[in-house]
Amino acid sequence: MSDSFSSLPDRDEPLSRRRLLEGTALAAGAVAWGATANRAASADDPVAAKRNAAAKRNAADKAATKGNIHQSLVEWCYAKHWNFDELCQVAKQLGCESVELADPKDWPTLKKHGLVSAIARSHGFEKGMNNPDYHEICTDKIHAAIDACAEYGFPNVITFTGFREDIPDDVGAKNCVDGFKKVIGYAEKKKVNLCLEMLNSRVDIEMKGHPGYQGDHTDYCVEIIKQVGSPRMKLLFDIYHVQIMDGDVITRIRRHADYIGHVHTAGNPGRRELDDQQEINYPPIMRALVEIGYTGYVGQEFIPTRDPLAGLTQAVAWCDV
């Protein structure tokens, strides 16, 4: 398991423009109910067939066009399918506004395409603020990320509690508060948010779960944020991880409305596409975000199990409420 977002999957050979356009054509036929589309033409499934036909007729309307949810693509999930410039093209094509967690060296490419990085990397998730031994390295990386975001006008920097390493939860929380207080004043000065991500510790599959991660419950992370006591200290509300560890996703969105600074998506189980092969019903969750007045970004962070452009088209459409 990587301890840093700088360790990204290797990229395949870049796609040609023709192949990218071919993928676009394929994605235009994707329906809002995922794998059902693969069965839709079946004569013994007339309801699905009708839905699929309607989706194909209205394919041009399936991008993010309503403007209520500002959508982003999380770079590490799709880096092996497209090079960075191509991924930016995909984001624009889908109506997304950001490609996030990318290497800052690629940020000029974001600007070229009129995109932002909704949230930036800092330190890794294994060695975090719950252990004072790592405060210095975390602080240095967070400072550097804040500076980069301030220069480009990007809003958020990611941060993590770190793994338990036999540290009691109450001690880990106190250490986090102490560590974040060392950097939050700088974030305030630079007008950049620091977003603490809650991760699941139940799934023992690389990048689908993080056994040993201390900040594995929403309320635990929110309590740390409250004790830091800054409007620049926020929660990265990852719907996939919250569903696995806590459930009650909409209730938690409403309860923690004042603290949510960024949102991630994925289907559960499997951190897969947002389709009918997983259990999370995304449209009402997106509507709940709109209802609480959330104006931040929603990052699509699933690991494709099929054509990535078709899966992204479907996910972006489903979240466009």
Which role does the model predict for each range below?
Residues D103-H113, E126:
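Glycine-rich, proline-tolerant flexible connector loops at the mouths of alpha/beta enzymes
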Residues S2-P46, A53, R57-S72, C77-K92, ...:
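Histidine-acidic metal/acid-base catalytic patches
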Residues S117-F125:
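Short hydrophobic/aromatic-enriched beta-strand-loop microsegments
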Residues E22-A35, A60-A63, G128-K234, I244:
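Active-site acidic/histidine proton-transfer and metal-coordination neighborhood
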Residues L87-D106:
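Catalytic domains of carbohydrate-active enzymes, especially glycoside hydrolases
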